[in-house]
């Protein structure tokens, strides 16, 4: 059984027991989370919502929050003595999917 959920403008395919990294939600560890924007559910037969499946809820539990690996953005213009170096680290919330109710 799997579901496709929407969170933070992105779509994720999840199953029970999956650990997913979402964009930062600002929640404490061990907090229960409900995702009500369920786009599709498959439990033997596929139910596709218009745009969401009515009555379907995906439940999860926050494991932790953290920061991803650093990504270096380096721009250089040749022969101009011009260069820019920037770094970026993505903040994320790690969630374990506990139940899919459809």
Swiss-Prot record:
Domain of life: Bacteria
Record keywords, A-Z: Ribonucleoprotein, Ribosomal protein, RNA-binding, rRNA-binding
Gene Ontology terms: biological process: translation
UniProt keyword rRNA-binding present: yes
One Gene Ontology molecular-function label: rRNA binding
GO CC terms: cytoplasm; ribonucleoprotein complex; ribosome
The keyword Ribosomal protein belongs to this UniProt entry's keyword annotation: yes
Family: Belongs to the bacterial ribosomal protein bL21 family.
Assembly notes: Part of the 50S ribosomal subunit. Contacts protein L20.
NCBIfam families attached to this UniProt entry: L21
Biological function: This protein binds to 23S rRNA in the presence of protein L20.
Protein name: Large ribosomal subunit protein bL21
């Amino acid at each position: 059984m799997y579901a496709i959920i929407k969170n933070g403008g992105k779509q994720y395919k999840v199953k029970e027991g999956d650990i997913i990294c979402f964009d930062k939600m600002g929640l404490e560890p061990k907090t229960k989370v409900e995702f009500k924007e369920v786009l599709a559910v498959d439990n033997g037969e596929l139910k596709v919502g218009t745009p969401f499946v009515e009555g379907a809820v995906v439940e999860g539990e926050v494991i932790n929050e953290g920061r991803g690996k650093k990504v270096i953005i380096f721009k250089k213009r040749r022969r101009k003595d011009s260069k820019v170096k920037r770094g970026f680290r993505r903040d994320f919330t790690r969630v374990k999917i506990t139940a899919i109710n459809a």
